[in-house]
A protein has these predicted regions:
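Acidic, serine/threonine-rich low-complexity regulatory regions at protein termini
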Residues: 1-183
């Protein structure tokens, strides 16, 4: 997925890092983060925006994803507050409309998080599973910052993060027959 904007990879990375911080502050579900980043990247691949519009895109993508994933999404006024009231409610709602129409309401795709959850169920990792999967999830979050990884499938990101986490923590035989079948 390539972006059709003046937005540089570093600007995108700063935005995603800020979204991760806000995501943690509101204690949102992990999948909400992945949906937010998917919305941002999908929108940027289809529409040109100015660098100055990147922040409102991020806030609005987070708003949309929380409506989609969360039982109790944060209120728009709370998202505006963490954005230091840089834009109005009307501006965010207009951006929401623009995103939804541009993406034709296609807001999700299988995420690396979901694949990691699947791999967790079929994995042969014995002992310290929580530590391995927590580390793999952390690696996946880091991967969200790097636009050069957009060319890889979510399943590949999940598999790579799991292998790297397991190898880093000295776990062997991560890939059993069930994992081969799952991937």
């Amino acid at each position: 997925m390539q972006t059709a904007t003046e937005v540089k990879d570093t600007s995108r990375a700063f935005l995603i890092e800020w979204i991760i911080d806000v995501h943690r502050k509101f204690r949102l579900l992990p999948e909400t983060l992945y949906v937010t980043v998917y919305i941002i990247d999908s929108f940027l691949s289809l529409k040109q925006i100015k660098k100055s519009q990147l922040h409102i895109l991020g806030v609005t993508a987070l708003l949309i994803s929380t409506k989609y994933e969360e039982i109790y999404p944060p209120e728009l006024k709370d998202l505006l507050t963490v954005s230091e009231n840089k834009f109005t409610k009307a501006e965010v709602l207009q951006m929401e409309k623009d995103i939804l129409l541009t993406l034709q309401f296609d807001l999700t795709a299988p995420s690396a998080y979901r694949f990691l959850e699947r791999f967790r169920r079929v994995s042969s990792i014995v002992g310290h599973e929580e530590k391995v999967f927590f580390f793999a999830q952390y690696l996946q979050e880091i991967s969200l910052l790097d636009a050069s990884l957009l060319k890889y499938k979510a399943s590949e990101i999940a598999a790579a993060s799991l292998i790297l986490a397991a190898k880093s923590l000295k776990k062997v035989n991560v890939w059993n027959k069930d994992m081969e079948k799952a991937t």
